[in-house]
């Protein structure tokens, strides 16, 4: 299942590379693709290849742990 998300990096201490690495290692996302960067808003559009819907719950946990804002597209 592919899910696009927009991640706001304003309030996070991690870089987009660190976020992608965490998603792929800690949370079993097979493939994280950075589709676009919106410089004005400091946001990234990511395409996540998730194994199943349960990963969406884990995504919420990671977002909470990293203290980032995420929007589903």
Indicate where each model-derived feature is located:
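Short glycine-/aliphatic-rich beta-strand segments at the starts of folded cytosolic domains
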Residues: 1-11, 44-46
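Weak global preference for isoleucine
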Residues: 6, 16, 62, 68-70
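A structural detector for beta-sheet-dominated domains
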Residues: 8-10, 35, 49-51, 71-73
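Short amphipathic alpha-helix segments
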Residues: 10-31, 59
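Generic preference for flexible, low-structure residues
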Residues: 21-23, 39, 62-64, 72
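Acidic, low-complexity, intrinsically disordered interaction modules
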Residues: 24-57
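Conserved short beta-strand edge segments in small beta-sheet-based binding/regulatory domains
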Residues: 29-34, 64-73
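Charge-rich, low-aromatic oligomerization/scaffolding segments with amphipathic character
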Residues: 54-66
């Amino acid at each position: 299942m592919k899910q696009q998300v927009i991640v706001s990096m304003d309030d996070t201490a991690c870089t987009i590379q660190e976020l992608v690495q965490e998603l792929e290692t800690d949370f079993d996302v097979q493939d994280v693709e950075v589709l676009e960067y919106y410089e004005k808003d400091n946001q990234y559009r990511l395409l996540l290849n998730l194994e199943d819907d349960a990963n969406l719950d884990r995504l919420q946990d990671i977002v909470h742990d990293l203290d980032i804002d995420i929007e589903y597209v």
